[in-house]
Amino acid sequence: MNIKRAKEEIEHTVKAYLAKDALGEYAIPAIRQRPILLMGPPGIGKTQVMEQAARECGVALVAYTITHHTRQSAVGLPFIRQRNYGGRDVSVTEYTMSEIIASVYAKMEATGLKEGILFIDEINCVSETLAPTMLQFLQCKTFGNQAVPAGWVIVAAGNPPEYNKSVRDFDIVTLDRVRRMDIEPDLPVWKDYARAAHIHSAILSYLELHPQNFYQINADVDGTQFVTARGWEDLSNLLNTYESLGLQADEELIRQYIQHQKIAEDFSAYLDLYYKYRDDYGVEDILAGQAKPAAFARLLQAPFDEKLSLVNLILSGLETRFSASRRADAAADSCYAFLWETKKAFAEMPAELAQEPNCWAQLFDQMTADYEAETQKKRTAGLLDKPTLEARLQTAKTLRSWEKELLRAAAPDADAAFKVLRTQFGTLSDARDTAQQTASAALEAAFDFMEQAFAESQEMVVFVTELTLSPAAHAFIAENGCERYFQYNKDLLLDHRKAALNQELEAEQRRHGML
């Protein structure tokens, strides 16, 4: 099973386990809600899919790496309590609440969400003293004498023994009480995630050429060498930040993330070439509609991997513009909705309050503060993905700048105050239009170059396919259109259908002995 399918299964499980009957009771009793056990190699994305699943299901998430805990923190600390049993006073041992269970209650209190996912990572790598506690947890859904609260779905994750020497096998009794999912690395599935997460285009381009280097764990005389999906993503974040700071990544830096010597050397060499192609071909000039004549001449002699790298560089430049347009669009939409809520609030302000100095700015300040508080609450609950969080933070920043304009204007009435805000929104709307026009012009320039350089070759197929698969590109084109994209995409679909029909025809002829 790949990680995408595992995420879908987790989401379906959460919905099923939290479904209620006509009496308000859970449709599947807690005793029949089997914990999910994810087994897969390290760095494959198990923790990330838990965050995504919780966010998309609208529930809280408490995540623990159990190898960081002792028996005392997992079970609780012992203390002596006096009891009377059968007329005889005795001293008995009880336990404080488990730190993990306490964290669940703390999360419920902080977020207001009463249902969630309790995720325990590296569950089969615990110490000998903690192993019985983990078995009890999976079998009985308790830590010590404290049960996991109702409405919390248990998901655990572990590594197969070939990846971790401290792994402990679960017995059949335990395995018969869980839902085990074995997860394997899958590059095409990861690329779907990578496009949405804006993984550095050099990494995507490199893995397109060398898919075997996506995930490897090799043991030799010098120790274990490895490269994981987590390593590629973390390296991507660093490369993007380095580029924004004007810094250059070298092989020594890359080896800190790609801890496989041959792959680190290979990617480092490719990254140098990638940047060289960007400068030599003038990708920004191409997207500005000013491609250099020398670029076309060089492409005539270029090998396929160089051509593919150039296509990915063009796609990366477009992706930057599509994302900027999306952010500008989201900011304008969010502020527009807030603007009309403000107009309604202005109209409903009591007459006696409307006479006070700066009353409109004060009301706007309170509404903005409420918006910021809502954002923080959702952020604490983990209900905002990165793009949504960035959009809300940018909206709050914009609203604060509008508040300053309101204070400066000292509007005498609601109409005058709203006019100030509407003027500010006009500037925001203009910025949205500019971002959209910039992205559209770059897309047309890219098609001009691709047609002149590659016509309808394999490189054009890659270009159009990647535009189709990119969430940012797909959303932009769906909203703003692009005739040449639609035409090439239609032709590609027809070609695929013809190829599929030819394959079916050949298969039919073979069955009848005609070939």
Regions found by a protein language model. Give the residues of each.
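Alpha-helical lid/collar subdomain of P-loop NTPases
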Residues: A196-L353
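Context-gated lysine
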Residues: K4-K7, K15, K20, K46, ...
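Terminal-proximal interaction/regulatory segments of ATP-powered molecular machines
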Residues: L300-L515
